[in-house]
């Protein structure tokens, strides 16, 4: 993949491709995730078998106590469309919201403007600028199916998490719906919104079992949500 820059064709690496994809889709991103209009609802019903991202987001966030007061990493924060109210309410916590896309991050910053316990940081999940075992909770909603280096992302989110604490998230898994898999492989991946390879349920369970001692994992269509204890 390449773009024209100053009259010259410049090759894009995968990370840049992803950032450009999200910048070009900024006006529809929240609508699709939250089913904000009739076209989004039809898209979810047709290609995702009605799986409701709003419901999954609430299930993910329900793993986090309302009185949580530790260090929390949210990666990728995206536009914070699902997490805004929960993070704002956790006033005694220290929350780092990280995203590779500056465009997504700018939208998240607007939502968290004035809240000193929340910081928005541009960064790469495969190379987190954080100390080992520095987080009490790591949250990753709709991130791992987009990360270019999934192995490093799993390693880094594990590295920064304290022993006995929780890794919480949701992501797309392949093998549950031919229609969804076709959409992901032929449309979403080519747009740069998703990045192969993708795990099956069994492959994801095996990855998590190698890294975490307790796993609470649930399937909803082609999406999985989980809470793991290190």
Predicted feature descriptions by range:
Residues 6-66, 81-85, 104, 111:
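Conserved class I S-adenosyl-L-methionine
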Residues 137-149:
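A short SAM/SAH-binding and catalytic strip from SAM-dependent methyltransferases
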Residues 73-127:
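Class I SAM-dependent methyltransferase SAM/SAH-binding core
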Residues 126-137:
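A short acidic, Gly/Pro-enriched loop at the edge of an enzyme's catalytic core
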Residues 103, 148-152:
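Short N-terminal helix/helix-N-cap motif within the alpha/beta-hydrolase-1
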Residues 151-163:
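A short glycine-rich, Lys/Arg-flanked "PGG" loop and its adjoining helix->strand segment in the class I
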Residues 226-230:
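C-terminal lobe and adjacent flexible extensions of AdoMet/dcAdoMet transferase-like proteins
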Residues 168-225:
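C-terminal alpha-helical "lid/dimerization" subdomain adjacent to the S-adenosyl-L-methionine
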């Amino acid at each position: 993949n390449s773009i024209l820059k100053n009259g010259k064709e410049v090759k894009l690496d995968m990370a840049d491709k992803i950032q450009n994809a999200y910048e070009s889709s900024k006006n529809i991103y929240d609508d699709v995730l939250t089913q904000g209009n009739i076209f989004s609802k039809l898209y979810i019903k047709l290609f995702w078998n009605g799986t409701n991202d709003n419901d999954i987001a609430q299930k993910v966030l329900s793993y986090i106590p309302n009185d949580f007061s530790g260090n929390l990493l949210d990666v990728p924060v995206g536009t914070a469309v699902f997490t805004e109210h929960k993070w704002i309410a956790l006033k005694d916590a220290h929350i780092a919201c990280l995203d590779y896309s500056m465009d997504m991050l700018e939208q998240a910053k607007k939502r968290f403007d004035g809240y000193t316990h929340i910081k928005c940081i541009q960064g790469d999940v495969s190379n987190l600028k954080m100390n080992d075992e520095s987080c009490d909770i790591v949250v990753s909603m709709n991130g791992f199916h987009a990360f270019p280096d999934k192995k490093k992302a799993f390693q880094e989110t594990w590295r920064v998490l304290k022993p006995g604490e929780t890794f919480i998230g949701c992501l797309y898994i392949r093998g549950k719906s031919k229609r969804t898999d076709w959409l992901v492989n032929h449309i979403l991946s080519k747009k740069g919104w998703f990045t192969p390879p993708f795990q099956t349920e069994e492959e994801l369970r095996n990855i998590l079992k190698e890294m975490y001692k307790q796993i609470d994992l649930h399937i909803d269509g082609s999406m999985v949500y989980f809470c793991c204890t290190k």
